[in-house]
Each structure stands twice: as C-alpha cells, then as structure tokens.
C-alpha cells in the first residue's frame, strides 16, 4: 500500500520536478484522504499512507516555494464511486479473528456506506480543477498545504483537530515538565 499511495506519488514527482523547477512555476497536487487525519480500526495502514502523503506535501510547500511551485494534498471525503466495492478495496489476506471485535464495525460501516457516499465525483473534480488553476470560486485564493474536499471531509477533519486539541489540553501539565532546569518558561 505504501508502494502505491506514497512512493508512487513520489516517483511521479521526482520525474516532473526538474522541468517544473526550470520553468519556475507549477502546482503539485498529491492525493491524500480524510483517512490521513485519524487511524481507523481495519484501515490503519491505509490511514498511515495518507497521513504520510499529507506531511510530505507540507514539507514540499516549503521546499518548492523558492521555485515558484505550489503544493497541496487533496484530502477527499467519501465520494460515490466504486472505491468501497469488493474488487477495489484491499482486505487482509490472513485476518486475525481475535481482532474482529475491534474492526467489524468499520468493515460493516464501509459496506453499508458503499454507493451511499455523499460526495458527487463530478462536483469534486470541478472543485479540484478550479483550485489547481485558481479559476472560478478559487480565483485569488492561495492553495493550502492540505485541501479538504467535501462536507464530510471538513466535518471529519474538524473532529480530528478537536480530539487532538483535547488530548494536548488534558496532558499539557504532565508533558511540559521535560525541559532542563536552566530553560526559561
């Protein structure tokens, strides 16, 4: 999964970046997912690949800016495609029955969601084109390092941010005591 979702995108970029740097312009659009914002039981490896792409893209923003090249990681929510259908999803070949209790709700939820996803692929594609070409609704906007795509993506990302903020707040008094004594607060 990392070979396709992460290293595949890196290989394509490695092939086109020399000419983009030479022309001092362009846009890099990597494909992430809302899965890159939280680990989901039964989808941890997929989520990890999408998180890796997002963080890699954030680094690219700084690395490519001196060349006039922008980078963004498009993070779609669920779009009504065959992505969740039998022949398109990766399933563990040697599933561990003892993990079923932790993963069954995810598998059942994704199966029920198949062909009921809220996102319209044509509308999503239009937003992507407008964002990358800075036309239409995206005229005059700067591309963010991570571009959520879809109402469900925005909702899921906000929930992930809130969970992380809550964890920071709850543990701040414990984890901030690690500085050397000669370091000022």
Spans of model-derived segments:
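A hydrophobic alpha-helix adjacent to the NAD(P)-binding/active-site core of NAD(P)-dependent oxidoreductases
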Residues: 1
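Active-site helix of classical SDR
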Residues: 13, 49
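A short helix-coil junction within the Rossmann-fold of NAD(P)-dependent oxidoreductases
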Residues: 15-24
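Residue(s) in the substrate-gating loop at a strand-loop-helix junction
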Residues: 33
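Active-site-adjacent segment of SDR/Rossmann-fold oxidoreductases
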Residues: 38, 59-70
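Active-site loop immediately N-terminal to the catalytic Tyr-X3-Lys motif
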Residues: 38-44
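SDR active-site lid
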Residues: 66-142
């Amino acid at each position: 999964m990392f070979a396709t979702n992460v290293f595949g995108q890196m290989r394509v970029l490695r092939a086109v970046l020399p000419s983009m740097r030479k022309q001092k312009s362009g846009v890099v659009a990597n494909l992430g997912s809302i899965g890159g914002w939280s680990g989901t039981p039964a989808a941890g490896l997929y989520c990890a690949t999408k998180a890796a792409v997002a963080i890699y893209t954030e680094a690219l923003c700084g690395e490519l800016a001196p060349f006039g090249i922008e980078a963004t990681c498009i993070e779609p929510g669920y779009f009504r495609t065959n992505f969740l259908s039998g022949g398109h999803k990766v399933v563990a070949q040697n599933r561990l029955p003892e993990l079923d209790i932790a993963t069954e709700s995810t598998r059942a939820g994704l199966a029920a969601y198949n062909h009921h996803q809220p996102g319209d692929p044509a509308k999503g594609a239009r937003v992507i084109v407008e964002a990358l070409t800075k036309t239409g609704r995206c005229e005059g906007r700067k591309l963010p390092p991570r571009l959520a795509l879809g109402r469900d993506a925005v909702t899921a990302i906000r929930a992930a941010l809130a969970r992380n903020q809550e964890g920071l707040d709850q543990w701040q008094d414990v984890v901030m005591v690690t500085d050397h004594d000669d370091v000022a607060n």
